């Protein structure tokens, strides 16, 4: 059985999600201890439990220790299944983090997988669902992944109530992909939304972001608005946010910012724009989030690649550490300092369904 110390690196929930995701793909049993050891409230929270439950259902797994606050679980998968699965994370637990855990297993399932999730789509400490829709899954397509993510309803902190539907078709293996440099920025797209709030909130977020981007010299900027009149607003809300993504010659890079009580709409827009410009300024092909989220996919894919990331996060280091436990033949070499631009050279294991 593979043993994973959950206090390694950044010591958060990502170690748990990645470990159980790769256990589901490889069907190798795993014991994870010291779960979220470096967090103020260690142990499993509801969204972590739902991620494990989802993968347990997809693999007929035996799971021990799965309860709120637990700092150790054992996950013993039996067989990877296709089908339709429904999970309610409750209130504003992150649907994006659950989807990150489920996606690798869904791709290697023996048939189509559909996952319906309720929870938070736009919540702190988690990629917003629009980042997955417009950056993460489109980049996975370059590996040959066939996925679809439909946003049914948004859910913000603290009430949640969001709904998404994810679907994937199986792959026999992933085609390797990677770029070091992003190439020229062709255009910047964005989506600024607000629910249970006046329309001007979404407009001001978009306008502020556009001004920062254009002032930097970017010309082709187009940010869509999403807003609902009170009589047709199905959300629990209130909440707002913006996601921006740069379409470049060789890649996609994204950035986001969430609204909050007392935070001016202009600040939300400016924050997202500055994050995007900061990552674009490195010239690398991947933004700081994708630099980490791509690790399992370049590892499972067939062949060698090089990817350039805007910032080497502790998340990325942690990801590599965990993936190597499940794929010992994996070769990874990282050139760069923590929180600085970096290049990762990978020889994937060519995992076959």
Curated annotation (Swiss-Prot):
Record: residues binding ATP: 100, 289-292
S-adenosyl-L-methionine listed as a keyword: no
GO cellular component, one term: cytoplasm
EC number(s) stated in the UniProt entry for this protein: 6.5.1.4
GO molecular function, one term: ATP binding
Residues spanning the membrane: none
Catalytic class of the enzyme: ligase
Keyword Nucleotide-binding attached: yes
Matching InterPro entries: RNA3'-term_phos_cycl_insert (IPR013791), RNA3'_phos_cyclase_dom (IPR023797), RNA3'_phos_cyclase_dom_sf (IPR037136), RNA3'_term_phos_cyc (IPR000228), RNA3'_term_phos_cyc_type_1 (IPR017770), RNA3'_term_phos_cycl-like_CS (IPR020719), RNA3'P_cycl/enolpyr_Trfase_a/b (IPR013792), RPTC_insert (IPR036553)
Keyword terms: ATP-binding, Cytoplasm, Ligase, Nucleotide-binding
Catalytic activity annotation: a 3'-end 3'-phospho-ribonucleotide-RNA + ATP = a 3'-end 2',3'-cyclophospho-ribonucleotide-RNA + AMP + diphosphate
PROSITE patterns according to UniProt: RTC (PS01287)
Database matches in Pfam families: RTC, RTC_insert
Major localization listed first in the record, in broad terms: cytoplasm
Subcellular location: Cytoplasm
Active-site residues from the entry: 315
Signal peptide: none
A Gene Ontology biological process term: RNA processing
Xref: PANTHER family: RNA 3' TERMINAL PHOSPHATE CYCLASE, RNA 3'-TERMINAL PHOSPHATE CYCLASE
Family that this chain belongs to: Belongs to the RNA 3'-terminal cyclase family. Type 1 subfamily.
Function of the protein: Catalyzes the conversion of 3'-phosphate to a 2',3'-cyclic phosphodiester at the end of RNA. The mechanism of action of the enzyme occurs in 3 steps: (A) adenylation of the enzyme by ATP; (B) transfer of adenylate to an RNA-N3'P to produce RNA-N3'PP5'A; (C) and attack of the adjacent 2'-hydroxyl on the 3'-phosphorus in the diester linkage to produce the cyclic end product. The biological role of this enzyme is unknown but it is likely to function in some aspects of cellular RNA processing.
Protein name: RNA 3'-terminal phosphate cyclase
Annotated source species: Ignicoccus hospitalis (strain KIN4/I / DSM 18386 / JCM 14125)
Lineage: Archaea, Thermoproteota, Thermoprotei, Desulfurococcales, Desulfurococcaceae
Gene: rtcA
